[in-house]
Amino acid sequence: MDQGMADELARLAPLLSGRIGRTIVLVGLMGAGKSCVGRRLAARLGLDFVDSDAEFEAASGSSISDYFARFGEAAFREGERKVIARLLDGPPVVLATGGGAFVDPTTRERIKAAGTSVWIRADLELLLKRTVGRDHRPLLKQGDPREILGRLMEARYPIYAEADIIVESTDEVPEATVIRVMEGLITYLDLEKTV
């Protein structure tokens, strides 16, 4: 991270200080950078970072891959729904969700009611670069990753577009995306205050 980026992060953080009254929920496809960006964003905002997948694994006592294999996607989504609802009932945090969480209508409505959603959008090539060869991506084990991600983008991007804030994730340092999220939050909170 260069000095200009560090200065911009330092400038933006006070503009959000004391203004975060709801959980910031990061949504998007696997590999978009939700966890990486979320950790850095939480540190800048003085909030805890929570990964809904890690919370699911802790609650179920099983990895998501194993849970998927044993019980299927429908059972996983039901458990994920409960975990996210519990997290939204707590104090504000930065919450990174699994790629399919926001697609679930019940989860999406709960996020809209109790959180501020941020879609971290990335193009196919970047998603492939970040996900191929990782063992913890059960959906990518079902065929050609390019084809699977392309189908997921086609099906999910129109739903992700319902998020309160949309930012691009590019192949640059994560802090660049953190800056875009912080700018989006400032604009969103300013607009929310005037409505």
From Swiss-Prot:
GO terms for molecular function: ATP binding; magnesium ion binding; shikimate kinase activity. Substrate binds at residues 53, 77, 99, 156. Its EC number is 2.7.1.71. It is an enzyme of class 2 (transferase). InterPro entries: P-loop_NTPase (IPR027417), Shikimate/glucono_kinase (IPR031322), Shikimate_kinase/TSH1 (IPR000623), Shikimate_kinase_CS (IPR023000). The keyword Transferase applies. It comes from the Bacteria. SUPFAM superfamilies: P-loop containing nucleoside triphosphate hydrolases. ATP binds at residues 31-36, 137. It is found in: Cytoplasm. Pathway: Metabolic intermediate biosynthesis; chorismate biosynthesis; chorismate from D-erythrose 4-phosphate and phosphoenolpyruvate: step 5/7. GO terms for cellular component: cytosol. Binds 1 Mg(2+) ion per subunit. CDD domains: SK. Its cofactor is Mg(2+). It catalyses: shikimate + ATP = 3-phosphoshikimate + ADP + H(+). Mg(2+) binds at residue 35. Its main location: cytoplasm. Keywords: Amino-acid biosynthesis, Aromatic amino acid biosynthesis, ATP-binding, Cytoplasm, Kinase, Magnesium, Metal-binding, Nucleotide-binding, Transferase. NCBIfam families: PRK13946.1 (NF010552). Catalyzes the specific phosphorylation of the 3-hydroxyl group of shikimic acid using ATP as a cosubstrate. Monomer. This is Shikimate kinase.
